[in-house]
Design a protein with these regions (language model features):
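Short, internal active-site loops enriched in acidic
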Residues: 124-126
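Hydrophobic "lid"/C-terminal helical patch
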Residues: 148
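N-terminal catalytic or cofactor-binding beta/alpha core of small enzyme domains
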Residues: 1-114, 119-122, 131-142, 151-159
Length: 159
């Protein structure tokens, strides 16, 4: 492994709460992070993210909005397993929407294997066309930033 940690924010800033990951990494970029940590905004460039991960990392933290049936604004940390390549599977890339599952599937199909992968997800309230986060998701930003900082410093967050 490379000894690096990658924190990647993904999402579409033109689909309201889908911009959650982008906003979290924007706020994180204003704060100090431990040595070896890269904080990047990948926006809707999930394919670029998958290729970046092929360089290897010990810890990968993906920050994104994800509909999980929770109350809007709920922040959840999940441990994610990168799937093994499936030669019989169809295409894993949807040019219009690359979900967290799609990013991990693409990474697996390319043979990428981060040491540990976490998803810091926020339940969206509104992913309609428009700019700006909904109230519940905007209010969740400080908690999400603290959560990622705790992950990076090895504090009490567990997946």
């Amino acid at each position: 492994m490379s000894g690096r940690t990658l924190v990647a924010g993904v999402g579409n800033v033109f689909l309201r709460d889908d911009a959650f990951g982008v906003e979290v990494v924007r706020l994180l970029a204003e704060r100090p992070v431990p040595d070896g940590v890269q904080v990047k905004d990948f926006g809707i460039r999930g394919v670029h993210l998958a290729y970046d991960l092929l360089d290897g990392c010990d810890l990968f933290v993906l920050v994104d909005a994800a509909q999980r049936g929770e109350t809007p604004g709920t922040v959840t940390v999940l441990e994610v397993e990168v799937p093994e390549p499936d030669p019989d599977a169809g295409p894993v890339i949807d040019a219009h929407s690359l979900t967290p599952d799609g990013i991990f599937a693409l990474l697996g199909s390319l043979g990428g294997r981060p040491g540990r992968s976490l998803l810091v997800a926020c339940e969206p309230a509104d992913v309609s066309a428009g700019m700006g986060l909904s109230g519940p998701v905007r209010e969740a930003l400080p908690h999400a930033v603290r959560t990622v900082q705790e992950i990076l410093t090895g504090e009490t967050v567990s997946a």
